[in-house]
Amino acid sequence: MADAKVGIAEGEVAEFPMRSAYLPIPFNAGIKCNPVTSAIGIIILWGLAIYCMVDPEGSLTSLTAAKAGTTYYFTWLYIVTTPIIIFFMAYLYIFHGNQKLGKDHEKPEFGAGSYFSMIFSAGVGIGLFFYGVSEPLWHLSDNRFDTGFHSQAEYGVHAINLTLYHWGLGAWAPYVLVGIAAGIASYRENLPLTMRSCIYPVLGEYTWGFWGDLVDGFSIVVVVSGVCTSLGLGAIQIVDGVNLLTDLGLVADSEEENTARIIAIWIVTGAATLSVVSGLNFGIKFLSILAILASFVLCFLVLFLDDTRFILNLMVEACGWYFQYNVVEVAFATDAFGQLTRGNGRGIDGSSMSGLGAYAAWMNDWTIFYWAWWTAWSSFVGLFIARISRGRTIREVIHFTFAGPLLYAFIWFSTFGGAGIRAYYRVREVIQLGTLQGDADMYAVSGIDGSTCYAPPAYVEVTAPVDGVNITWTFENEFPGISPVCGTIGDISWWNVLHMYYDYGPFLSWVAIFSIAIYFVTSSDSGSLIVDLLANNGRDEPGFWIQRVFWAMTEGAVATALLMSGKSDALKALQAASIVAGLPFTVLLCTVCIGLYRFVHQHAEPEKYEGYNQWKMSFAGGVYCYIDTILSCGGVFSNADRSYIHVPDMRTNWETLRALCLPPWSVLLIMNKLNPGRQNYVSNMTLAVVVGGLFAGWIFLFISSVAKTSLLAFAWLCYFSFAFILAILRYEVRAKYNIIGNIGEDVGAGIIGYYQLLAQILIQLDEEPPALEL
């Protein structure tokens, strides 16, 4: 197995045995990258881009179908992963908060203000504008909690609460996990700043081979998918804003509007390219501070132009609701009954067939989209957090990435979401007032997009009969200058809110467009920086700017392709890409939890971990080494020691083949070694027969399910029972040989690679177990 020898810089010695190729280019330091990792990203991303451009309708159909399948089968996985990560972060904060992302003597590279600005700009910037008003209104109109809350006041605060659920701790949990894991791996353990380093305690030396290449390569795909979602949202928002403020005259859902969005993407991509080439300390840091200052100014102005007392009350109330409901109750809500469709058990209300609560796909369109989006961004934002967190403690990082953004979300959504909901309620008030006066549209005016809005009067008294008795209503408007108010729910909601404040609408809108554009740039340039790190084995070397330009162009191309695919349904294409890309990465995040747990415990209890033994054959090795051999053209590594990765010997091949085809035979051999003697032969044979029956039953029932679908349940019962028995065997062998691991890893190994598990155990049993200490 070998590195790609073509073009390796003369005299270069790899610090870590990862593939590295170098291509000299005139007037530049050249291109240096991991060829396998880069190829994975390039092939998948440009393949997706070309597919979407060549066949927009077909690609949208495929993406939507993939999204539907992902959410249909894996809602539970997305939902349960997030609170697990949050509780794990709480554990680290309490018990290991003083451990540093770096050496004990190192100090933070960036000050608190610039540090928070860069984190926040990379993390959630653009989305705050796109969803700041529209999301609370969507949740309000859906009567999301119709079965439990009945007053309009409760609808309003719960709409804000649900929005905060999506943008609070759950949004930042994947970022913080990867940030802390990568920071400790890189700056304390001296490993490369890549995703593969986060799972080094799990894969060991095999991190530097094919498995690590696969993790980093797919991380590139997921990073670009997540960034493109934000780029698409930013393009939609910028074009909508400029169209409303100028005479562009773009018609909604037209080809001209889509073209304008694509132009916006490439303008910002060009700016992002200049930023990423200029480096972290100048371009990204400066723009991040500028973006957060501009958005803070906008939020401050709206807070004091609107009903300040109401918004401050809402902030306080939202805090209480958030910690009462979102930490546990809503955090584990999968909307199990709500996702049922009509004909499959959806609840009905009297004669209504629409059911209670939101529509069946609500969970897919909102919570699952968000969790997938945050997951897709986790390697990008997490590695970026790690890159700028050197010298900070775990506790400090959690302060800046959990407490800070959560507080900002409370302020932002209470201000803009509260203003939007109050305007929505005022529309209903004014319509009712006009109805009492004989004309529901008495106060109707034209909104900025031509839709119907309303101008609330300053003071009106209306007398109307109720049950035969005349009742007088007094309508007293304390804020007559806040007009017109609009009830439209969608992308336009943001601009409607900004344009209702006296005559300041255009000014506020331009400030918003400026902020969105800056966040747009910071998302793209930060993403390009991290993708380049992943493609270049974690090396952040000056002079190799051309490869960062390439990745910035790739992000722009994929975002363009998704917008071309979706057109009027651009958001659907963007959401689908994030959800599908985020699924396998959710599994990776669970593995990162294991890796981080071992990192902090090895640091806290080094003597305990020094006593553990390793498997003679790694689960990541064995026949999987053939993949590394093929990728390295069968050669020998010339610039690093990789003797642990070699062509499998005949024993390994035979044990794996036997386990793959005849697992009961392997189980019998294992049991005879674990429990030798004639007195144990019957029990050993019995277990082997049971394993064989489950294995054969799985295959037979799985094939038979083609004719009778219901048999699939029994097939999976057989397989998981089979895998669990093998996991117990692995657990016993680990205990006997004092090998590091846990039952979760054992079960996972049994499910995803039973043949590898059995071969691993048989080869391990060739050695004598360590003597017990008295």
Descriptions of predicted regions:
Residues 207-210, 214-517, 562-570:
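Membrane-embedded translocation segments of transport machinery
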Residues 26-36, 70-76, 104-122, 150-170, ...:
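Transmembrane-helix boundary/entry motifs in multi-pass membrane transporters
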Residues 19-27, 61-67, 95-112, 137-162, ...:
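Flexible loop linkers connecting adjacent transmembrane helices
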Residues 10-11, 29-32, 36, 44-52, ...:
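Helix-loop-helix module between adjacent transmembrane segments
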Residues 53-74, 138, 236-260, 278-289, ...:
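Membrane-lumen (extracellular) interface motif
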Residues 609-774:
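Intracellular leaflet-associated regions of eukaryotic membrane-associated proteins
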Residues 25-30, 56-71, 92-109, 158-166, ...:
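Membrane-water interface regions at transmembrane-helix termini and the short interhelical loops
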Residues 2-155, 173, 594-600:
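N-terminal alpha-helical transmembrane segments of multi-pass membrane transport
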